[in-house]
Design a protein with these regions (language model features):
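Short cysteine clusters
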Residues: 50, 69-72
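N-terminal pre-ligand scaffold of iron-sulfur
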Residues: 1-63, 91-110
């Protein structure tokens, strides 16, 4: 698998201001609905879809390093995506000189 990096913000400070006092926000990066999570001064990007039954995680809460689905209360580790025998896709964030990038895996023969 390869990773394609997509620029999505200017800086971590911009993200802090955008989130204000919220912990989570649904955003779209390259036509993908993702959830931006701010927890313990770290930022995470996860798929905005619970792997349990496909519900959106827009109203999820963050507890003890886990994102908790508001519908069925399944919790998923923010760093690994693991939880309840299921796996929530998470995406790396990389800071470069010109901004913040989200990494999305893709398959390529070359």
């Amino acid at each position: 698998m390869k990773i394609r990096w997509i620029r999505f913000a200017d800086s971590f400070e911009e993200l802090r201001l955008e989130l204000n006092k919220r912990t989570c926000a649904s955003i779209v990066i390259d036509d993908r609905s993702v959830l931006l999570v701010h927890h313990n001064d770290e930022f995470y990007l996860v798929k905005n879809k619970c792997p349990h039954q496909g519900s959106k995680l827009d109203r999820a809460v963050c507890e003890d390093g886990k994102i908790v689905c508001p519908w069925h209360h399944y919790g998923f580790d923010l760093k690994t995506g693991r939880g309840g025998g299921l796996y929530l896709e998470n995406y790396p964030i990389e800071e470069k000189e010109d901004g913040l990038y989200a990494g999305f895996e893709y398959f390529s023969w070359f």
